[in-house]
From Swiss-Prot:
Site (Important for substrate specificity): 16, 74, 156
Record's protein name: 7-methyl-GTP pyrophosphatase
Residues at the active site: 73
Alphabetic keyword roster: Cytoplasm, Hydrolase, Nucleotide metabolism
CDD domains: Maf
Similarity comment text for this entry: Belongs to the Maf family. YceF subfamily.
Amino acid sequence: MPAIPPKLILASSSRYRRELLSRLRLPFTAISPDVDETPQPGEAPADLALRLSVAKAMAVAATHPGSVVIGSDQVATVDGEPIGKPGGFERAREQLRRLSGRAVEFHSAMAVTDGVHTETADIVTLCRFRTLTDAAIDAYLRAEEPYDTAGSAKAESLGIALMDSIRSDDPTAIIGLPLIALTRMLGRFGLDPLTGHPA
């Protein structure tokens, strides 16, 4: 009798991450983690993303024993400085003016845990923004309202028009859930997207 694969949970309220995970065709549920996302003093952006991805996964795993839980977090940086979520039009406009013609690093961190063992990964994506006019910035912001997105640009939709180039080992990392790395990690927990059975 084949082993029953463990229940899979995505520790996220992001619809983009849910859409990405559904590409792997593994049944899962999504649960919003209750985690304080405040950076620690002097914490490097990459360390913050990794710490939060682990915290999100562990918070959900603590109340769902026997499940495999995926936590993720993404931090964008320019010149090593973090770029947060803008929260509104004016701040988003300022961000995009600052990013115009520049390179931005996106750290897409992930943690997969069963509550006992934890695997982590940080996939870096380098995005170079086009030189943007104020008219282009305003048109984009009115069309997309990307106020909940670090860097004010949603590469999974119209925000791709702001980009000059994107370099990464994983094309889904920029959207917030690196599926190539995730597939590898899930295999270590007995979940294989191709067979639906233990890897």
